[in-house]
Amino acid sequence: YSQNAPPNIRKVRNEPETPSSSESVIVGAKVTDPDGVRSVTLEYCVISPGSFVPAKIPHPVPNIPVNNPQQDNPDYEKGWVSVPMVKNGNQGEFASGEDVYSALIPPNENRSLVRYRIIIEDTKGVRARAPFVDDPSLNFAYFVYNGIPNYEGQAGSSLEALPVYHLITRQSDHADCYAYNGGKQINQGTQARFYYNWQGAMVYDGVVYDNIKYRLRGA
């Protein structure tokens, strides 16, 4: 219990939802506090293609200690950039509406994963971060994507008739999960077969589900 709660933040979003590599992105949110809002700060981190950073360190395989919690990955907190968010700034769709704060993220290369979070503080110095500390997603995110490329003589536009999924993860984690190396195959009949040991980001229909956990199905 606290007599002074941190600012209230809601309606967090980014426009466009799925930018191309030539587009800047506006991040906006509505922030209010009865004591007044001192500052709203955007923190963002660009994950280049092929360089995914999990928030947790997976256990080594094949003998996964399923009862031991995974350790935080110190690399997750590296590379974040802080930008002040401006109240009712002239930022596209975020320009209208009271108590709306926004900031601009410059363009990034195709297939970049851009994570972001927002730090809010009231005039009495009470701070909070969104997503909140008990939110397993840890951050908001968007995926920079120029669309399906042409493939084997097939136009990318025709391939869009099927749903497109992206699993963004470390190559080493993906290899350990599939366990083409027989020495890393998890024994049948153990709880380790059902343990979600690896992290990634799933992208579908323009929405990023970051810091999800996965395992090999068929245990």
Regions inferred by a protein language model and the residue ranges of each:
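Aromatic sugar-binding surface patches on proteins
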Residues: 77-83, 89-104, 110
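Structural beta-strand segments of beta-rich domains
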Residues: 23-27, 38
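Proline/serine/threonine-rich low-complexity linkers at boundaries of modular beta-sandwich domains
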Residues: 1-10
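Surface-exposed, proline-enriched loop/turn segments that connect beta strands in immunoglobulin-like
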Residues: 12-16
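Phosphate-handling architecture centered on phosphoinositide signaling
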Residues: 17-18, 26-30, 112-219
